[in-house]
UniProtKB/Swiss-Prot annotation:
Record GO terms (molecular function): ATP binding; ATP hydrolysis activity; ATP-dependent protein folding chaperone; heat shock protein binding; protein folding chaperone
PROSITE patterns referenced in this protein's UniProt entry, alphabetically: HSP70_1 (PS00297), HSP70_2 (PS00329), HSP70_3 (PS01036)
Listed name of the protein: Heat shock 70 kDa protein 2
Domain of life per record: Eukaryota
Lineage: Eukaryota, Fungi, Dikarya, Basidiomycota, Ustilaginomycotina
SUPFAM superfamilies given in the database record: Actin-like ATPase domain, Heat shock protein 70kD (HSP70), C-terminal subdomain, Heat shock protein 70kD (HSP70), peptide-binding domain
Family: Belongs to the heat shock protein 70 family.
Length: 645
């Protein structure tokens, strides 16, 4: 039986881990990296995910998609989506009020939902785990920022379904990090732990109490839109202005130049966590102009000063909400790559009056680590280390209904431990009112117009009665994924209705998910074909070059008759020319071409080797050398190439 995995689906990087042999193992991808860029690229011939996609982004900026997490579960006219679009080289359009990403793939324009892009990243994480575990993986726990609302959680779950995963549970990133921390530290008594999670695109602060394996989230706050990329943006804008001053040219008109600058800025930012100054050197950045400059840590801190200061507000908020003063916080745990920035650490240390910060867990891997532990528990792992863990999470926003006059009446308050169920009795507003409209909102404002509408439904068929007489019981039921079901029942008649928040909510319908699953399978098939084609091409190429090398081998040179040598040289020349002029040849065409060349080469080789007294070692069947990957080129299957660039 294959194991359940934990996936940290990040804005910029993702990570996958599994619980086995009584411990968590973070799984490295095919490039040997323990985190994988959350990037998907589309080219004329194939789809790339992860490192391969990020590595070619400067050459293909318009068709390389990243930051899907900043779009997932949001509306197109969301202010944050509109502001992000200024920084993205790919096109985002509105389809039915929802953002979709438009790219060109194999010469055709295609649109994808953020869920589909995220599902491709999840698929890559799943494949990484399958390669490591040697079997099919179906079950996973996927993490989201604590501050994600209902639609963002639903959309993340949908992405999991499209990637072919059974998402056992959606858990909050800081909670997962707390498990990673708590598992390492079996301590006596109750501990108040503050998790400070500043990642590539999101920021979360949570305050938990850990006591004898019970993790209870007391409060959570943050910004679903603050992270390392925002610091990169500040650097990019700074250098764009500098380039303009020095060269009187605006490089923002060129997506490739902007991307190369962004990559250099990201590298500079990382360097400044350990060095006081760093240089940026980019040859021929824009219109042939080289860009050489430097930046100090102090200047970087000044550029991002307001963003860094913002990180303290949610810390104050969780302390207020959980009614704990800062002196009572036992541990401050850092999670997320951006917590390596010295200024962020200093602000936090100063806020806690010089307290030591806890850096014992790897900030990049902690979330996936905790998710893997939770996955093991949910799939029935009973090892000594996991059996005592109990996770009590909270609802990030209050949920309730609209009552007379547009007033928001919450049934489930923010920071209530989930899963939870709450019922309240309401009545009619007018005499002989035949039905009621139940409108479900989430948010913290007193009036519904300032909150987020989750969905609505009608309960009709109420018998005529004076206002205030009918009794309508409204029930809110939040499951362990912080996903909501609402029902309303009229007590007199027993008539009831309930809402599946799906479509009003901007959730994908089951038909759309089906369609996307089909597309995902089609992509997987296309990826497989692209791989086979590359292998066939590499096989043919290496066969031709092996023939050329063989004709130049000193011990065979003398055995070759002039006519045969000429024939082989002609075959090699024509083969190379054919490859150059048939760059888009299909797998079958490549295999047929190899067969055709083999039929021309083999008789000549047989003649040489029989004259030389048998084939030299390593040339099975008289063919010139084995193709890479160890397969003899004589076979119909073509050689297999292990490594793809």
């Amino acid at each position: 039986m294959t194991k359940a995995i934990g996936i940290d689906l990040g804005t910029t990087y993702s990570c996958v881990a599994v619980w086995q042999n009584d411990r968590v193992e973070v799984i490295a991808n095919d490039q040997g990296n323990r985190t994988t860029p959350s990037y998907v690229a589309f080219t004329d011939s194939e789809r790339l995910i992860g490192d391969a996609a990020k590595n070619q982004v400067a050459m293909n900026p318009h068709n390389t998609v990243f930051d899907a997490k900043r779009l997932i579960g949001r509306k197109f006219d969301d202010a944050e989506v509109q502001s992000d679009m200024k920084h993205w080289p790919f096109e985002v359009t509105s389809v039915g009020g929802k953002p979709q990403i438009r790219i060109e793939y194999k010469g055709e324009k295609k649109t994808f939902t953020p869920e589909e892009i995220s599902s491709m990243v999840l698929l890559k994480m799943r494949e990484t785990a399958e390669a490591y575990l040697g079997g099919t993986v179906k079950d996973a726990v996927v993490t989201v920022p604590a501050y994600f609302n209902d639609s963002q959680r639903q959309a993340t779950k949908d992405a999991g379904i499209i990637s072919g995963l059974n998402v056992m549970r959606i858990i909050n990133e800081p909670t997962a990090a707390a498990i990673a921390y708590g598992l390492d530290k079996k301590t006596e008594g109750e501990k108040n732990v503050l998790i400070f999670d500043l990642g590539g695109g999101t920021f979360d602060v949570s305050l938990l109490t850990i006591e004898e394996g019970i993790f209870e989230v007391k409060a959570t706050a943050g910004d679903t839109h603050l992270g390392g990329e925002d610091f990169d943006n500040r650097l990019v804008n700074h250098f764009v202005q500098e380039f303009k001053r020095k060269n009187k040219k605006d490089l923002t008109t060129n997506a490739r130049a902007l991307r190369r600058l962004r990559t250099a800025c990201e590298r500079a930012k990382r360097t400044l966590s350990s060095a006081a100054q760093t240089t940026i050197e980019i040859d021929s950045l824009f219109e042939g102009i080289d860009f050489y400059t430097s930046i100090t840590r102090a200047r970087f801190e000044e550029l991002c000063g307001d963003l860094f200061s913002h990180t303290i507000e949610p810390v104050e908020k969780v302390l207020r909400d959980s009614k704990i003063d800062k002196g009572s916080v036992h541990e401050i745990v850092l999670v997320g790559g951006s917590t390596r920035i010295p200024k962020v650490q200093k602000l936090l240390t100063d806020f806690f009056n010089g307290r030591e910060l806890n850096k014992s867990i790897n900030p990049d891997e902690a979330v996936a680590y905790g998710a893997a532990v939770q996955a093991a528990i949910l799939s029935g792992d009973t090892s000594e280390k996991t059996q005592d863990l109990l996770l009590l999470d909270v609802a990030p926003l209050s949920m309730g209904i609209e009552t007379a006059g547009g007033v928001f009446t919450p049934l489930i308050k923010r920071n209530t431990t989930v899963p939870t169920k709450k019922s309240e009795i309401f009545s009619t507003y007018a005499d002989n009112q035949p039905g009621v409209l139940i409108q479900v909102f989430e948010g913290e404002r007193a009036r519904t117009k300032d909150n987020n509408l989750l969905g609505k439904f009608e309960l009709s068929g109420i018998p005529p009665a004076p206002r205030g007489v009918p009794q309508i019981e409204v029930t809110f039921d939040v499951d362990a994924n912080a996903i909501l079901n609402v029902s309303a029942a009229e007590k007199g008649t027993g008539k009831s209705e309930k809402i599946t928040i799906r479509n009003d909510k901007g959730r994908l319908s089951s038909e759309q998910i089906e369609e996307m699953l089909k597309q995902a399978e089609q992509f997987a098939e296309e990826d497989k074909q692209a791989l086979e084609r590359t292998q066939a091409k590499n096989g043919l190429e290496s066969y031709i070059y092996n023939v050329r090398n063989t004709t130049n081998e000193p011990q065979l040179k003398d055995k070759l008759e002039a006519a045969d040598k000429e024939a082989l040289e002609k075959i090699v020349k024509e083969g190379i020319e054919w490859l150059d002029s048939n760059t888009t040849a299909s797998t079958d065409e490549l295999k047929d071409k190899q067969k055709e060349i083999e039929e021309q080469v083999n008789p000549i080789m047989t003649k040489i080797y029989s004259a030389a007294g048998g084939a030299p070692g390593g040339m099975p069947g008289g063919a010139p050398g084995a193709a890479p990957g160890g397969a003899a080129p004589g076979g119909d299957d073509g050689p297999t190439v292990e490594e793809l660039d």
